[in-house]
Amino acid sequence: MQIYLDTANLDEIRTAASWGVLSGVTTNPSLMAKEKGADFKATIQEIASLVDGPISAETTALDADGMVREGREFAAWHPNVVVKVPSTTEGLKAVSRLAREGIRCNVTLCFNAIQALLAARAGAFIISPFVGRVDDVGVDGMDLIREIVQIYRQHRITTLVLAASIRHPRHIVEAALAGADIATCPFKVLEQSMRHPLTDIGIERFLADWKAWQQGK
């Protein structure tokens, strides 16, 4: 399973990229809004220079014509740009048109399996089910991932399943077990994923033993 970072913060992306684990980056209007004074185009292009993989840039238009217009513009910024559109009927229209032009799309804000199936039929490159938000309404978000994966495999659909709205490291593990192709997570969650108290204790013990051995020579 591939790991993407869900952020528009360049410092976070540089740091995570240095760990050698990133396969892509996802952004959205809310994440961009956190980067005060940043230029959208320049930010996406800088991200593409830091991570050699799909970079999702989301449209803000609500109609298909607007999404297509923005999507074409975004795709011209860098070959790795993937255009994010919402799981709506207008979004499906836009995906269908953009896909015919060879522009890859990430259909976002997916909350049920039928949305995922229709997005794939329209030509989506990626579908993004929101695990955490589904959990918030009392439904198991990982069940949604499993349903989509099963449908796609049964019908030999090549659209990639990206687990989004990841809240904690366990979500990443569960997404991998459920068969997701990708998990995208905030920097904080990715950083937490490599922390374990027993790892810290083990390092301290090894260093203490090494120091004692060196002093005893």
Swiss-Prot record:
It is an enzyme of class 2 (transferase). GO terms for molecular function: aldehyde-lyase activity; transaldolase activity. It catalyses: D-sedoheptulose 7-phosphate + D-glyceraldehyde 3-phosphate = D-erythrose 4-phosphate + beta-D-fructose 6-phosphate. InterPro entries: Aldolase_TIM, TAL/FSA, Transaldolase_3B, Transaldolase_3B/F6P_aldolase, Transaldolase_AS, TSA/FSA_arc/bac. It is found in: Cytoplasm. Its EC number is 2.2.1.2. GO terms for cellular component: cytoplasm. It comes from the Bacteria. Its main location: cytoplasm. The active site is at K84. Pathway: Carbohydrate degradation; pentose phosphate pathway; D-glyceraldehyde 3-phosphate and beta-D-fructose 6-phosphate from D-ribose 5-phosphate and D-xylulose 5-phosphate (non-oxidative stage): step 2/3. GO terms for biological process: carbohydrate metabolic process; pentose-phosphate shunt. Keywords: Cytoplasm, Pentose shunt, Schiff base, Transferase. Transaldolase is important for the balance of metabolites in the pentose-phosphate pathway. Belongs to the transaldolase family. Type 3B subfamily. This is Probable transaldolase. The lineage of its organism: Bacteria, Bacillati, Chloroflexota, Chloroflexia, Chloroflexales. The gene is tal.
